[in-house]
Amino acid sequence: MVATRSGKWEVRIVKLPTSSRRGFLKYTGLSALGAFVTACLSSNAPAAGSPSPSTGGVGGIASPASTITWKIQSGWAGNDIFQEMFLEWKQMIEDMSGGRLKIDALPVNTITNTSDAIDAVHSGTLDGAHHVPAYYYGKDHAVSLMGTGPMMGMSGDMWLAWYWYGGGQAIFDDIMQRKLKLNVVSFFYMPMQTQPLGWFKNEIKGPDDFKGMKFRTVGLATGIYEGMGASVISVPGSQVASSLDRGLIDAAEFNNTTSDIAYGLPDVRQILMAKSYHQASEILNVSINKTKWDALPKDLQAIVKYATWAGSGSGVWRSIDENSRDYKKLLDRGIKIIKTPQSVLDAQLKAWDTVVAKESKDNPEFVKMLDSQRQWAQRVFPWADAINIPTPDPVSYKAMFK
């Protein structure tokens, strides 16, 4: 295809010698032919300065007019591993959408605090929030079942499978939209590792050590620690270290070795009690304003969903990498990491039974969600227990490195 003197395009067939034709096909192949066809088709594209189509134009580059921007605030400080996951999720969406959907990713407290973020999403002050439901459990204690408690023996992945394939998403959305009248849609991803019992001045040797202790935790976990005698005080993650340092609280839990270092917990407490049932595998939560979600084109909705799924796997892998590195850093700086006694774990399970009984009395949505989780656990746990070697597996590890 060439331009004539009149400015019109016309196709001219040029016969190449046999050897040249073979070389053309050998070294250019389908990609060159595809580029040739694209160049031909582009002759019909609008001239420079013409309005771009809503799809973002040729090559997937979105014009400003076709770009949708969401303002989403996280519950994490800029140096937190969860903020890294938030930014990776944002990048996945922007890359897969060709820039048609952009995320203005804001760290914690930029527009509002963590407990009020869900209201800001509902009202449209924020288009979304990246957090955990324990931060807004004051709305309805049932939402904290999404990641609090002993998980009925399931792994985080098994629990997340309940959310996506066992009816959990519909139950949660029903609570948020019908019961709480919140204009919000929710997505859960990235099952976390078991969170430590907490950071303490002294080693915890039994459940009685919690009696009279001023302790920081969130969500339904408050009932577990209160059941062991602690006085639970709500403190935002960014203020935990300073609250410990000033004596406002005696001990605290936050999340994982990487986040705990980021928030300065090992600077004020040198004993970390590992293993706990209070949050055996919490799950990250993306909350989106429903009006903005419903207005999003279907292909962009799919991109958000599948970026969440992809971010789930990547987040788990990132956690394994960074948490293990930071575990060693804690040991190297002299932090004592001590296994929680079985007597404390047993006391947590007993306290959880009390929490469940109390919450089930007058909250039918709590009962519905818990029953659904139980039914899922009764199906998947026996299968997983019969088929899988538990991991991590100390037996094969010791055999390999004896």
Residue ranges and their predicted role:
Residues 171-173, 182-183:
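Short secondary-structure capping/junction motifs at helix and strand boundaries
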Residues 156-172:
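A gly/proline- and charged-residue-enriched helix-loop-helix capping module
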